Amino acid sequence: MSKIAFVGAGSMAEAMISGITSRSNQSPNQITVMNRSNDERLSILNTTYGVKTTHDYDVLLKDASIVFLAMKPKDVFSALSTIKSFLHEGMLIVSVVAGVSMDSIETIINKKVAIIRSMPNTSATIGKSATAIAQNRFVTNEQLQVVTTLLETIGQVTLVQENQLDAVTGLSGSGPAYIYYLVEAMEQSAEKIGLDKEAAKALILQTIIGAAEMLQNSTKTPQTLRKEVTSPGGTTEAGIHVLQSHQVQEAFINCIVEATAQSKRLGEKLSQEIQTKSLMI
């Protein structure tokens, strides 16, 4: 059984801790968590999940085989600079920090350590994340399998190349917000056409869940499934024509492309900042 350390104790760290402790054979007493100063937060994690907590880096990292980086991007340089003396080549670092490349992590710690970079989404909190991971050249097949198994406790895991993670961020990382935005519009339209709020909510949610399961279980393409619901001269066709007149499909494409571009811009900025700070040491 791996000894796991979490550097950072925010919502994503908690989602992973919840998944790992409830959906794997990992013992909570083999998980240690720390943050910079929030004792109340650590107390909640200890009480809720039975994990150990500390403010001592030696206690956190002694004998740890997997180190999860779960701090905010702006704190990565200072956190890694502080813990790098405790890191060694037998460890595996798993980063869930958005925008921070594996090269940047290697630059800060200046050691040949196995690194896996992960991009989950907020559905991790209910064990339904669409998570993409990328690995550096030092990761073994065994390490990859262990981390994949751990991350599968918060959802589905897909292995990609690191240069695809900006696209993953734009598509599935931000993806839940796009669906929530769609639901907002459906709720507003339900009110406009006179549907009861609670009834509308139930209908909307089940419609989305049902459509998602159809996509997951059917061999048919989304286009085929859509056309099967769209009878000539019918209600669905009338609605689709309005969406097409407003170029909704094109807007969604542009939305994801721009989110991807922004992820790349933010990542490049972070990399430059880390490089500059590293040169100053």
Regions found by a protein language model. Give the residues of each.
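NAD(P)+-binding Rossmann beta1-loop-alpha1 motif at the extreme N-terminus of oxidoreductases
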Residues: M1-H55, S129, E191-K192
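Short pre-catalytic strand/loop immediately N-terminal to key active-site residues, enriched for Gly-Thr
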Residues: I4, L165-G170, P222-K227
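Hydrophobic packing residues within well-ordered alpha-helices of enzyme cores
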Residues: M16, I20, L42-L45, A79-I83, ...
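Short acidic capping loops at alpha-helix termini that bridge into adjacent secondary structure
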Residues: S27-I31, E89-M91, V113, E198
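Rossmann-like NAD(P)(H) cofactor-binding subdomain of soluble oxidoreductases
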Residues: T48-Y49, Y57-K62, I66-I133
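Internal alpha-helical scaffold of NAD(P)-dependent oxidoreductase catalytic cores
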Residues: S104, I108-A114, A130-A167, Y180-N217
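NAD(P)-dependent Rossmann-like dehydrogenase/reductase catalytic/cofactor-binding core
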Residues: L205, I209-I281
